């Protein structure tokens, strides 16, 4: 046994009887047997005391269980005794018997102290001995001070371990910190082994204690293992071995994980492991004291996969004599770090599966001992090798090069002098820091170019680094700090485009070879630039591509004397370190360009060009300063001042006084807006740094009706001066509210001065008091009672108030000083140059130039009376034409525009909805005049009836303004933004200013007071600007929609009264809820209210004056009256109010700083109301009516259905009537879940996911079906009856409950309204518990599915077809939502649920989670919720957006579908938002890598920064219905070439040849990878005519009548041919025919003169013999064709095909086909598909519906496709390929002779007999060949001129359902006119198309474009590519017993038009079609298509057809 010879420590001898003193005699063994206790108790001195009889009595009483007597006796003795020693004895007795009460009495009342020495009679020792844990706790806690005496604890612990008291042991170790590794020792004693806690526990057999100790810091020592071998083994086996997670390779046995780490084992016994050695898969022996191991470890553990031996004292592992002894071949991981190995065991070299080897922190001097390593395989699977912290001097190549799978190598902190030569392995991470490396090998880029990501060669002795290090394409982190580098390789040769971190600190960069600093740094050895004089050296340069990737650059501690210029171009840099470069004195201004830089280290640099105070402020300030320098920034003192206030308050007069210092003489005209300039000099005594401030003053006045318009001129960073008339007193103060709210709404946090005029009208003696009162009123408006700023109002304090007299000018100087002081303190937040004061801020020169250009443009336009706005394109042009323009990116342009807006040069609104942000208004006066036209409309019935104007009338108002048809949409959006004209339908707008201020008739007469009424009051701190206008517009839209729904339901019933429209509320009391209808008699609306009356009740919403002092309303009052007591209308109204506030006025949902809500809802008690109505006195109302707080109602509704009113407790009020929205009474009864049928638990196992705002989604069952339940959790009171009346806690809980109810209601309502196959259906709702049930997605979210499938594939983890279908279904769902005016707002893969991953299923996904969706009432939407990364960049606070935000998210989801990855752009929301707004998008890959061209293009279109450039969901749906979308993979430009050849085998390669003689070269394209594998490889020789690949050789025919055969073995390039053959003519085509003999072929070479040469080939080499077949001879002798016949012309062989299972070869002979019988190698038959001058150009075989072989051929003149039945040689069909619109063409197929015995036999006389229809062929110079046919076909072949007259019109491709069979194309898109299959036979094809209408091309070119190029067999379909680039796809289908052909698709990629004409095409590897295009310059481009067969097309068409059908069904169901 290894390790048994070790001697135990020397103190082992100290085991004696004295050691047993800790264990009292047998008398102490039992709890009762304490009678001898007295005799054993000894004094600290050791002498026994004589026991008094009372002690004996106490013992006896305890012994007899007479506790009370014992306690009485003990207390008596205690009272009598004075001796502390005696009291100590009493404490010991009580402790021994576990009498806790007495122990507490003695400790607390008698103050008995516990001794700290561990004597036998110490009460704590005694208590521990008997195991009284509570007594021990009490005793130890009585000790004074924070620390318990360690000796006492250790003694007690050893004792408790021996006695087996686990609770005491736990208490001592866990609570009091006793150390399980410490010996129990008394004073002046030696430690004894039996007093070691673990030893004592194991010896006494206390297993549970032993395990507890081992788990809390105790270790095995050699004494324990020697003295208790079996118990030790038992413990190790039972408690430290568990079942392994790794699979077992041993049948029937459990795989084991041995965890013997951190036990300080001195040895491992072989016996411990022997019987389980076959089961061990993981063995952890780390952190022990092992000097050696038994021989079985690790070599004999056959199933071992993980071995950890780290932190031991191993000098070596057990030796093995031969490799046969090593049976641990399954080992995957070994950790042998922190040992004493001098070399690795040679046995490791035999572990062929080892993946990870950690051997750091050893004494390795050699890797392996070479002499002992014999016949080893090498660690070929090793991925990670860690050799850090050793003594290695070299890494032997013979070992390193065997590591073929190595991905990570760490050799840091060794003594390596050199690094091994690179070898072939996928190395990703290489760490070699802190060695003695003097050079690095060159060839890193050869082997690790695309793998190595992280390289660390820091702290070495490198003087230079090889170029290859910077040519590693995947390199992300390169650390070279702490070397002796003088220069780096030339940057123009770098290719490390992914580099993120480059650390070059602590080097010699900037020194020359002599050690002296150069004048100009030659840091990078690049080509020197000529400088003045003879100096030629180069600055440090970085390649331009690093600007995209490099984030961290360290150049500190070098010898640089200038910042390299290229550093300033690294725009992505976030950290730059330049410190400790003594020569660096200046920072270039260009550094300011680095917008992402947040860390700039310039420590210990003496920078002269940045002031010290700027440097102190940190990197941001330094960069801002440099940016200002770079951009030639100038101090700008121009600001915008806006003067506002009610009319006739003295605004213009005040302005003139400020400008001139004099009172004006003339009154001003009532213009709406006046603009003027004013310069204010610095007042005397001011300490401001600016001399003067210049204002662009906008004096906004005009009539009161225009007040709402004026808010559009309010912009940020302007100074607002609100002017009011002091003389008008409180009334004028009330009027201020409107202006102050307007300013805060449109320019939050603006600086506002409130200036009172007419000071002279207040009598002097009352002036001070009166002004103080008025000031208090003003402050009361905009500050809360506590003094904090009121929400919704600007921040106005007494410092912002001023008074002035415009008559005697009193206060004018003070006002000037105030304006100057306030202006100088205004901050320029969010500036590009940095946060600074607005006055005197630095503005880039280019912004100021642009300002000048804009002002000049405005001047030019006003002189020419032109329109005063710019479009975004015009502004871009203006920017580009501005001299010195340095505005480059989108963000910078936005900053420039902000500057123009802030200075009053421009007006611009960044809303993206309807493209409003694309207009820039130059002149506010002009805009005001345009708006005045609308305000000049009087409410006449002609133009605007009831305040509603038709869109065409609104357009008429634009005539003469300069707004065009292109910009009217933006103008209308502008009107809606400022509530001037709000859309109420698609073609009508509400003009709120035309509405009367009060209802036009007495509404009170309509409201009959009755009992059946409920009310709701919204009390608001302020009513936001625009609230009523938007509310009334929404109500009009909703009422109209409801009328329409009712009208649709009642289409067949006529209305009794035409003037009456029907209006429906849903929900009635019957059965909780059902549907209830009323007739809407009248709808009346005014500026702040709306009333709808109907038979049996009414509904009214109006403003309520909550506060008399606020003239503007302070709330909303809703009344709903219904004789049927159906109050669900209240839910309808409150929904509208709440959603409007949430979306447009969220400020109202906040609270004041003192916690009071800004908006509160109250419900007057209807019972009180009814009784009050009988009283006449209105003053009594407030006392007699109870107002329920909505919060109370909500909290009560959680638990009960009624609420009690304190005024009539006996009459409870039903909550269902009071707050119907909480009980969802407007929902149909069928949607309420029966709770008894809902089975769900809320355990963790059933959680499917988390929703927003704390909702949880559970898996459940309803009526036996699986469902998903979305549960809204509301916090409950423990005891709601006694809940505190008015606490903040209650308010918070109520707010939480209301939020939950509101979210629940919004989402449930939305789900209820949505019915679409791609949208998750609502199954039902429940109030108790608050939840709704949805369909359950069987496969979870798309994100989960993608992450599960993305591991194995690089693109499209779900496969191509499924990706297409899912993308289509998402777009379809979005299109439906947008049609319903719903903006999803949170589209992401988490919210897309997956139903099926089968491409055959009709529905694969559904959209879910409408928690933050927005209903858009034709007006766009506001709000910033969403998920960063998916959220469109235009979603920002206060920006109105439209449904295009969903299209941005859709683009991101497409990225996920294509890549399988989340669109990650950073970890922080701000970082992501910034990147997206800059136009940075996730990187996907080139189209040829992704291979889904259209979807990738759509993705990029969707995530365009400009919303108007994104497509609509509806247009995406229609795009994706075209099969081209799905089948077009990519196009690949291939440069100039001369010939294209495809391989006929299973390979994906095609080959181009170019040039001739010496310059002849070839290019190989791998179409599977979209890669040019070989580019222009030279292969001299003549120009090619033809090429064929046969097995591993290539046959190449050239124009000099030769065939060269090249071998392809060993992937060597084609250089020297193996063999050359001569032919009598040029070879025009090849064909390889397999022969029955293995590896034998016949190679047929068709020649230009019509001959066919036959070469037998065996094992890749042709035999000597070669035979020829002569077409001419066969024609003459066999088929009797005379020589003068045109068919006997010498036609080149253009096409050959193997037919009839290889028994025949058919080949072209001019217009005919000749058949070779392969068995006798003779021409046996001739077929006549065409007549001369046509020539067969293409030939292919495929199967028909019955699986019989058909041969298709194509010619070059008639453009006709002919089909033969190969077995009978019968011509079965013809199809003309020249139809400009071939989709849906059909042609009949004649049955073959075999099927119909009566049909005539084919002969070979001529073409006429073979025609299956009446066909004539004619040829003319003009039109070429035409086939004139008179068969029933969809294509009219009457003459070619029928195409020369009509453009190719797009047929409406609506789907139709046809009877489907296995190979029928039931899903081909058909015109809706042809509903049944019979009528499909006789379509009418119009022939009114003219050729010149088709396109710019002429007729001949047009017919050329329609010429078919080739016929291809793709699976079971025929593809016919045409010169124009489109592909006709033809299929055969069964048709009432016979067959017919049909064009099932036409594929046309418009992207290919610019690449010329389609020249050739081929099928490669059976499933891919490659078309080659060439233009006039012989530049070629490949278009690669997915080779779809009938099955794929069927799935494709059915997918959208079926979706359409399901959609229609859903609509019908509704």
UniProtKB/Swiss-Prot annotation:
Residues 840-1237 form the COR domain. WD repeats lie at residues 1539-1579, 1582-1622, 1623-1668, 1693-1729, 1730-1778, 1779-1948, 1950-1986. Residues 1839-1895 are annotated as: Disordered. Its main location: cytoplasm. It is found in: Cytoplasm; Cell membrane. Gene3D superfamilies: Ankyrin repeat-containing domain (1.25.40.20), P-loop containing nucleotide triphosphate hydrolases (3.40.50.300), Ribonuclease Inhibitor (3.80.10.10), ROC domain from the Parkinson's disease-associated leucine-rich repeat kinase 2 (3.30.70.1390), Transferase(Phosphotransferase) domain 1 (1.10.510.10). Residues 632-826 form the Roc domain. Residues 1853-1871 have a biased composition (Low complexity). It is a peripheral membrane protein. Residues 1791-1906 are annotated as: WD40 loop. The modification Phosphothreonine is found at residues 1061, 1075. Disruption phenotype: Knockout mice are born at the expected Mendelian ratio. At 4 weeks of age, their body length is slightly shorter than that of wild-type littermates. They progressively develop severe osteopetrosis, reduced bone resorption in endocortical and trabecular regions, and increased bone mineralization. Knockout animals have lifelong accumulation of bone, and females are resistant to ovariectomy-induced bone loss. Osteoclasts derived from mutant mice form a reduced area of resorption pits compared to controls, suggesting dysfunction of multinucleated osteoclasts. The modification Phosphoserine is found at residues 1064, 1074. ATP binds at residues 1248-1256, 1270. Autophosphorylated. Autophosphorylation in inhibited in its dimeric state. Phosphorylated by protein kinase C isozymes PRKCA, PRKCB, PRKCG, PRKCE, PRKCZ and PRKCT at Ser-1064, Ser-1074 and Thr-1075. Phosphorylation at these residues activates the kinase activity of LRRK1 to phosphorylate RAB7A. This is Leucine-rich repeat serine/threonine-protein kinase 1. It comes from Mus musculus (Mouse).
């Amino acid at each position: 046994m290894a390790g048994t010879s070790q001697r135990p420590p020397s103190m082992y001898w100290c085991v004696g009887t004295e050691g047993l003193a800790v264990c009292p005699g047998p008398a102490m063994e039992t709890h009762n047997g304490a009678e001898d206790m007295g005799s054993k108790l000894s004094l600290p001195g050791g002498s026994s005391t004589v026991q008094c009889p009372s002690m004996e009595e106490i013992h006896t009483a305890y012994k007899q269980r007479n506790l009370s007597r014992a306690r009485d006796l003990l207390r008596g003795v205690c009272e009598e005794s004075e001796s502390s020693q005696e009291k100590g004895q009493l404490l010991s007795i009580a402790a021994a018997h576990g009498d806790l009460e007495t122990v507490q009495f003695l400790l607390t009342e008698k103050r008995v102290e516990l001794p700290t020495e561990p004597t036998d009679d110490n009460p704590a020792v005694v208590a521990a001995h008997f195991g009284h844990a509570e007594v021990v706790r009490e005793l130890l806690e009585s000790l004074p001070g924070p620390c318990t005496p360690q000796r006492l604890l250790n003694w007690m612990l050893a004792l408790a371990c021996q006695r087996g008291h686990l609770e005491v042991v736990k208490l001592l170790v866990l609570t009091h910190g006793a150390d399980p590794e410490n010996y129990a020792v008394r004073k002046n004693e030696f430690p004894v082994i039996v007093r070691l806690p673990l030893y004592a526990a194991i010896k006494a057999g206390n297993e549970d204690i032993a395990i507890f100790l081992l788990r809390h810091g105790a270790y095995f020592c050699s004494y324990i293992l020697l003295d208790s071998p079996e118990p030790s083994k038992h413990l190790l086996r039972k408690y430290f071995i568990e079942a392994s997670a790794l699979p077992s390779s041993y049948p029937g046995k459990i795989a084991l994980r041995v965890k013997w780490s951190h036990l300080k084992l001195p040895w491992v016994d072989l016996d411990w492991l022997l019987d389980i050695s076959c089961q061990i898969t993981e063995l952890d022996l780390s952190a022990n004291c092992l000097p050696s191991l038994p021989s079985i470890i690790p070599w004999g553990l056959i199933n071992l996969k993980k071995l950890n031996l780290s932190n031991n004292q191993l000098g070596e592992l057990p030796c093995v004599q031969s490799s046969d002894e090593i049976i641990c071949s399954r080992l995957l991981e070994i950790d042998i770090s922190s040992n004493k190995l001098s070399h690795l065991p040679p046995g490791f070299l035999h572990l062929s599966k080892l993946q990870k080897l950690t051997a750091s922190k050893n004494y390795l001097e050699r890797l392996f001992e070479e002499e002992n390593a014999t016949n080893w395989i090498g660690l070929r699977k090793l991925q990670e090798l860690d050799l850090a912290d050793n003594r290695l001097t070299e890494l032997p190549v013979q070992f390193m090069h065997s590591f073929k799978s190595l991905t990570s190598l760490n050799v840091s902190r060794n003594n390596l002098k050199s690094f091994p030569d690179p070898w072939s392995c996928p190395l990703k991470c290489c760490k070699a820091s802190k060695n003695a490396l003097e050079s690095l090998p060159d060839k890193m880029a050869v082997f690790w170019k695309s793998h190595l990501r992280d390289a660390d060669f820091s702290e070495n002795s490198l003087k230079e680094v090889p170029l290859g290090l910077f040519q590693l394409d995947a390199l992300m982190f390169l650390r070279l700090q702490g070397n002796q580098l003088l220069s780096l390789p030339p940057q123009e040769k770098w290719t490390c485009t992914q580099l993120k971190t480059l650390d070059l600190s602590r080097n010699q960069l900037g020194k020359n070879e002599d050690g002296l600093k150069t004048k100009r740094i030659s840091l990078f050895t690049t080509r020197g630039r000529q400088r003045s004089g003879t100096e030629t050296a180069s600055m440090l340069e970085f390649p331009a591509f690093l600007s995209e990737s490099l984030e961290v650059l360290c150049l500190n501690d070098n010898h640089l004397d200038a910042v390299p210029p290229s550093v300033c171009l690294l725009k992505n840099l976030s950290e730059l370190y330049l410190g400790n470069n003594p020569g660096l004195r200046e920072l270039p201004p260009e550094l300011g360009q680095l917008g992402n830089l947040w860390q700039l280290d310039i420590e210990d640099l003496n920078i002269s060009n940045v002031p010290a105070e700027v440097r102190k402020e940190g990197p941001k300030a330094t960069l801002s300063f440099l940016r200002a320098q770079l951009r030639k920034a100038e101090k700008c003192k121009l600001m915008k001042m806006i003067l506002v206030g009610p009319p006739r308050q003295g605004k213009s007069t005040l302005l003139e006084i400020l400008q001139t210092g004099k009172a004006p003489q003339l009154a001003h005209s009532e213009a709406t807006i006046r603009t003027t300039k004013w310069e204010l000099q610095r007042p005397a005594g001011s300490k401001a740094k600016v001399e003067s401030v210049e204002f662009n003053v906008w004096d906004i006045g005009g009539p009161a009706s225009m007040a709402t318009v004026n808010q559009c001129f309010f912009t940020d960073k302007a100074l607002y001066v609100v002017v009011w008339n002091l003389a008008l007193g409180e009334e004028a103060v009330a009027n201020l509210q409107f202006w102050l709210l307007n300013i805060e709404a449109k320019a939050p946090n603006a600086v506002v001065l409130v200036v009172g005029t007419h000071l002279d009208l207040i009598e002097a003696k009352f002036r001070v008091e009166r002004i103080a009162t008025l000031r208090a009123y003003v402050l009361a408006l905009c500050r809360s009672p506590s003094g904090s700023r009121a929400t919704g109002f600007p921040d106005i304090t007494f410092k912002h108030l001023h008074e002035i007299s415009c008559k005697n000018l009193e206060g004018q100087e003070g006002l000037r000083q105030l304006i100057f002081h306030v202006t100088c303190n205004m901050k320029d937040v969010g500036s590009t140059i940095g946060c600074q004061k607005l006055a005197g801020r630095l503005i880039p020169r280019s912004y100021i130039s642009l300002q000048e250009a804009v002002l000049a443009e405005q001047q030019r336009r006003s002189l020419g009376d032109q329109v005063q706005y710019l479009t975004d394109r015009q502004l871009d042009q203006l920017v580009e034409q501005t001299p010195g323009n340095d505005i480059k990116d989108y963000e910078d342009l936005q900053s420039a525009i902000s500057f123009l807006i802030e200075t009053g040069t421009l007006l611009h609104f960044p809303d993206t909805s309807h493209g409003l942000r694309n207009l820039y208004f130059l002149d506010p006066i002009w805009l005001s005049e345009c708006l005045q036209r609308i305000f000049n409309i009087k409410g006449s019935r002609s133009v605007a009836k009831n305040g509603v104007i038709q869109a065409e009338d609104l357009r008429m108002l634009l005539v003469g303004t300069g707004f065009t048809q292109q910009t009217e949409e933006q103008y209308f959006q502008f009107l809606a933004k400022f509530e001037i004209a709000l859309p109420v339908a698609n073609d009508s707008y509400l003009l709120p200013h035309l509405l009367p201020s009060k209802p036009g008739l007495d509404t009170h007469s309509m409201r009959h007071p009755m009992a059946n009424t409920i009310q709701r009051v919204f009390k608001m701190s302020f009513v936001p600007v625009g609230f009523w206008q938007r509310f009334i517009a929404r109500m009009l839209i909703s009422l109209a929609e409801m009328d329409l729904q009712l009208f649709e339901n009642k289409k067949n019933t006529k209305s009794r009264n035409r003037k009456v429209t029907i209006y429906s509320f849903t929900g009635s009391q019957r059965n909780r809820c059902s549907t209830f209808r009323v007739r809407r008699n009248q709808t009346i609306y005014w500026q702040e209210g709306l009333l709808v009356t109907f038979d049996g009740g009414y509904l009214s919403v109006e403003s309520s004056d909550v506060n008399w002092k606020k003239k503007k309303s302070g709330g909303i009052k809703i009344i709903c009256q219904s004789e049927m007591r159906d109050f669900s209308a209240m839910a309808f109204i409150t929904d509208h109010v709440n959603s409007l506030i949430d979306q447009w006025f969220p400020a109202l949902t906040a609270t004041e700083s003192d916690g009071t809500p800004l908006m509160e809802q109250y419900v007057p008690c209807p019972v009180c109301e009814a009784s009050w109505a009988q009283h006449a006195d209105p003053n009594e109302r407030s006392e007699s009516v109870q107002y329920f707080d909505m919060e109370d109602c909500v909290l009560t509704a959680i638990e009960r259905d009624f609420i009690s009113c304190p005024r009539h407790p006996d009459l409870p009020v039903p909550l269902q009537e009071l707050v119907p929205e909480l009980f969802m009474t407007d929902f149909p009864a069928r949607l309420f879940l029966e709770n008894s049928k809902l089975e769900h638990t809320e355990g963790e196992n059933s959680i499917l996911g988390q929703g927003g705002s704390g909702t949880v989604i559970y898996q459940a069952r309803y009526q036996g079906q699986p469902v998903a339940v979305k549960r809204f959790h509301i916090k409950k009171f423990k005891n709601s009856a006694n809940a505190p009346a008015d606490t903040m806690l209650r308010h918070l809980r109520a707010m939480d409950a209301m939020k939950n109810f509101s979210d629940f209601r919004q989402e449930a309502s939305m789900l209820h309204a949505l019915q679409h196959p791609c949208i998750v259906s609502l199954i039902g709702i429940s109030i108790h518990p608050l939840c709704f049930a949805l369909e359950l997605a069987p496969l979870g979210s798309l994100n989960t599915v993608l992450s599960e499938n993305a591991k194995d594939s690089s693109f499209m983890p779900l496969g191509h077809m499924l990706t297409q279908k899912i993308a289509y279904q998402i777009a379809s769902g979005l299109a439906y939502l947008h049609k319903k005016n719903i903006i999803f707002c949170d589209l992401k893969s988490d919210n897309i649920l997956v139903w099926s991953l089968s491409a055959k299923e009709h529905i694969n996904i559904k959209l879910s989670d409408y928690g933050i969706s927005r209903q858009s009432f034709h007006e766009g939407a506001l709000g910033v919720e969403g998920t960063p990364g998916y959220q469109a960049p235009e979603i920002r606070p206060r920006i109105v957006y439209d449904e295009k935000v969903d299209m941005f998210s859709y683009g991101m989801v497409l990225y996920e579908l294509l890549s399988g990855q989340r669109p990650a752009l950073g970890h922080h929301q701000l970082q992501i938002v910034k990147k997206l707004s800059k136009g940075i998008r996730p990187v996907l890959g080139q189209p040829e890598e992704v291979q889904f061209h259209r979807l990738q293009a759509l993705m990029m279109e969707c995530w365009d920064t400009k919303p108007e450039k994104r497509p609509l969901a509806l247009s995406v749906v229609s795009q994706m219905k075209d099969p081209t979308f799905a089948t077009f993979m990519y196009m690949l430009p291939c440069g100039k070439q001369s010939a294209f050849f495809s391989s006929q085998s299973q390979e994906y390669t095609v080959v181009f040849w170019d040039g001739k003689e010496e310059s002849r070269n070839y290019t190989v394209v791998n179409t599977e990878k979209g890669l040019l594998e070989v580019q222009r490889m030279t292969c001299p020789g003549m120009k090619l005519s033809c090429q064929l690949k046969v097995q591993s050789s290539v046959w190449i025919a050239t124009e000099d009548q030769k065939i060269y055969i090249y071998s392809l073995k060993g992937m060597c390039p084609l250089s020297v041919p193996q063999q050359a053959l001569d032919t009598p003519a040029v070879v025009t085509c090849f064909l390889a025919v397999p022969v029955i003999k293995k590896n034998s072929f016949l190679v047929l070479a068709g020649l230009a003169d019509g001959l066919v040469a036959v070469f037998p080939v065996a094992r890749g080499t042709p035999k000597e013999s070669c035979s020829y077949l002569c077409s001419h001879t066969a024609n003459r002798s066999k088929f009797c064709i005379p020589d003068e016949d045109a068919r006997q012309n010498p036609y080149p062989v253009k096409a050959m095909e193997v037919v009839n299972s290889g028994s025949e070869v058919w080949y072209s002979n001019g217009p005919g086909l000749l058949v070779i019988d392969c068995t006798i190698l003779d021409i046996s038959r001739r077929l006549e598909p065409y007549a001369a001058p046509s020539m067969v150009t293409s030939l292919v075989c495929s199967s028909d519906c019955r699986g019989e072989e058909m041969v298709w051929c194509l010619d070059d003149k008639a453009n006709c496709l002919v089909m033969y039945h190969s077995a009978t040689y019968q011509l079965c069909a013809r199809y003309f390929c020249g139809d400009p619109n071939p989709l849906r063409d059909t042609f009949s197929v004649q049955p073959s002779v075999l099927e119909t015995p009566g049909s005539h036999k084919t002969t070979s006389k001529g073409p006429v007999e073979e025609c299956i229809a009446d066909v004539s062929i004619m040829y003319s110079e003009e039109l070429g060949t035409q086939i004139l046919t008179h068969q029933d076909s969809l294509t009219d072949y009457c003459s070619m001129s029928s195409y020369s007259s009509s453009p190719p019109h797009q047929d409406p491709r609506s789907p139709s359902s046809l009877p489907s069979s296995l190979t029928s194309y039931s899903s081909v898109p058909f015109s809706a006119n042809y509903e049944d299959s019979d009528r499909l036979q006789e379509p009418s094809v119009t022939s009114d198309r003219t050729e010149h209408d088709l396109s710019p091309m002429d007729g001949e070119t047009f017919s050329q474009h329609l010429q078919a190029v080739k016929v291809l067999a793709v699976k079971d379909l025929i593809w016919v590519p045409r010169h124009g680039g489109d592909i006709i796809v033809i299929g055969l289908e069964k048709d009432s017993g016979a067959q017919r052909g049909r064009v099932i698709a036409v594929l046309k990629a418009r992207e290919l038009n610019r690449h010329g004409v389609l020249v050739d095409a081929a099928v490669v590897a059976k499933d891919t079609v490659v078309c080659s295009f060439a233009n006039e310059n012989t530049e070629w481009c490949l278009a690669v298509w997915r080779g779809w067969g009938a099955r794929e097309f069927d799935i494709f068409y059915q997918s959208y057809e079926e979706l359409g059908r399901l959609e229609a069904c859903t609509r019908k169901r509704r």
